[in-house]
Amino acid sequence: MKKLLAVFCAGAFVSTSVFAAIPPGNDVTTKPDLYYLKNSQAIDSLALLPPPPEVGSILFLNDQAMYEKGRLLRNTERGEQAAKDADLAAGGVANAFSEAFGYPITEKDAPEIHKLLTNMIEDAGDLATRSAKEKYMRIRPFAFYGVATCNTKDQDKLSKNGSYPSGHTAIGWASALVLSEINPENQDKILKRGYELGQSRVICGYHWQSDVDAARIVASGAVATLHSNPEFQKQLQKAKDEFAKLKK
């Protein structure tokens, strides 16, 4: 009996720590056009991820090396792409994936697929990253070095937002996973594009490499959670049906 009680208590402790409450903020109850999930349904990035690398650690040295590597690419074609990738607003996510997907993902050409991507954007970019971002409030590379990003549009706003994990990367990777499910024939191109969106954050100086790596983990968790949501399931099926018609 004592052993059973000990196991139960241990399990209760794990459950509490893994499914800790997400800090208050927007969710499907306040912005249903950008979320499918409630705060209580989202994964807890603070419980899932290790702390970000400390300044002076081996892992932080890698972050610094990747920052310098990315900075050298800013005046190249890849750097130009990174600057474009910084803007995911106003259909930016859908536009970013259209070429890799093989079809234009617009409200006109593929409204159901476009709606799916738009509606899940903050489940990945906000809910899945919120608790770790708010806890650690990690300084971003551009603020750490005092060097402007490759696209300064959101620089002032994001200087007050934690760097770890990367919200943009989470959006990009989650979108890539879902689009790969809709169009598996193009999965390699789609996933590569999703990976590139994350690396663009390093090149631009908005994020450290470890921010990006961590974001891909929470994005995968967010997509798994979304698959248990009835409204997401319905819209995903509509997107798949729409794609089947596009292929004909």
From Swiss-Prot:
Its EC number is 3.1.3.2. It catalyses: a phosphate monoester + H2O = an alcohol + phosphate. Keywords: Hydrolase, Periplasm, Signal. SUPFAM superfamilies: Acid phosphatase/Vanadium-dependent haloperoxidase (SSF48317). Gene3D superfamilies: Phosphatidic acid phosphatase type 2/haloperoxidase. Pfam families: PAP2. InterPro entries: Acid_Pase_classA_bac, Acid_Pase_classA_bac_CS, Acid_Phosphatase_PhoC, P_Acid_Pase_2/haloperoxi_sf, P_Acid_Pase_2/haloperoxidase. The keyword Nucleotide-binding does not apply. Residues 1-20 form the signal peptide. GO terms for molecular function: acid phosphatase activity. The keyword Signal applies. Its main location: periplasm. It is found in: Periplasm. GO terms for cellular component: outer membrane-bounded periplasmic space. It comes from the Bacteria. Belongs to the class A bacterial acid phosphatase family. This is Non-specific acid phosphatase. The lineage of its organism: Bacteria, Pseudomonadati, Pseudomonadota, Gammaproteobacteria, Enterobacterales.
